[in-house]
Swiss-Prot record:
The extracellular domain is cleaved and released from the cell membrane. This is Fibronectin type III domain-containing protein 5. Changing R126E: Abolishes dimerization; probably prevents inter-subunit salt bridge formation. Induction: Up-regulated twofold by muscular exercise at the mRNA and protein level; this effect has been suggested to be mediated by PPARGC1A. However, up-regulation at the mRNA level upon exercise could not be reproduced in another study. Widely expressed, with highest levels in heart. Very low expression, if any, in colon, pancreas and spleen. It comes from Homo sapiens (Human).
Length: 260
């Protein structure tokens, strides 16, 4: 009855199979009716899957591809990023503050620096960013006395940040030790000042004594010259007086002669 009913209503066209239970069984389970607007060769969802596209690869192959692309991008970023700062040192170390300084390579073009500070064996991190191309130092404040800290420095450019520098470990002194060293320095400076004053006084005394001796010697030489110049005159006067006493004159103007 079904065959006769289907054949009597519509004659089958040549080259077009009839639609029957056998045709419905050929469709995969779960596939809906194809849209009349769908392009030929597309599945019912409208997405085209090529055999060579990554979406058709196994999950492990796609994960390996993502990992490789990530490594390539990271390598490109690292190639463009600046080098890590060098010669990182900590100076002006006090109980609650310090100053970290560094250098960069001459060919590097940076727009700022990032300083990370943390306590040793503690995960808490302090991040300081300095947007200044000329600065090569940064002050660390609010430090705890007698505590160890670790400092890293990074250079910042347009391409990104550089790798972190070599870690620098330093320890803040105690306040009592700082005061003791300060008092010791003050005592040393006072002693040096006193010694300097004593040395200055001794030098002044020596100079005054030398000037006095020079004056005495000059006065003695002057007096000696005067005495030496007066000696011939004294000799002449003595000779003249001696001659006058040995040859007395006569009252009449003649010399007295002794009688034999």
């Amino acid at each position: 009855m079904q065959a006769a009913r289907g054949g009597a209503g519509r004659p089958e066209r040549p080259g077009r199979p009839g639609r029957g239970p056998e045709r419905e069984r050929e469709r995969p389970p779960g596939a809906g009716a194809a849209s009349p607007c769908a392009a030929p060769g597309l599945p019912a969802g409208g997405a085209t899957i090529h055999p060579g596209s990554p979406s058709a690869w196994p999950p492990r192959a796609r994960a390996a591809l993502r990992l490789w692309l990530g490594c390539v991008c990271f390598a490109l970023v690292q190639a463009d990023s600046p080098s890590a700062p060098v010669n990182v040192t900590v100076r002006h170390l006090k109980a609650n503050s310090a100053v970290v300084s560094w250098d960069v390579l001459e060919d590097e073009v940076v727009i700022g620096f990032a300083i990370s500070q943390q306590k040793k064996d503690v995960r808490m991190l302090r991040f300081i960013q300095e947007v200044n191309t000329t600065t090569r130092s940064c002050a660390l404040w609010d430090l705890e006395e007698d505590t160890e800290y670790i400092v890293h420095v990074q250079a910042i450019s347009i391409q990104g940040q550089s790798p972190a520098s070599e870690p620098v470990l330093f320890k803040t002194p105690r306040e009592a030790e700082k005061m003791a060293s300060k008092n010791k320095d003050e005592v040393t400076m006072k002693e040096m000042g006193r010694n300097q004053q004593l040395r200055t006084g001794e030098v002044l005394i020596i100079v005054v004594v030398l000037f006095m001796w020079a004056g005495v010697i000059a006065l003695f030489c002057r007096q000696y010259d005067i005495i030496k110049d007066n000696e011939p005159n004294n000799n002449k006067e003595k000779t003249k007086s001696a001659s006058e006493t040995s040859t007395p004159e006569h009252q009449g103007g003649g010399l007295l002669r002794s009688k034999i």
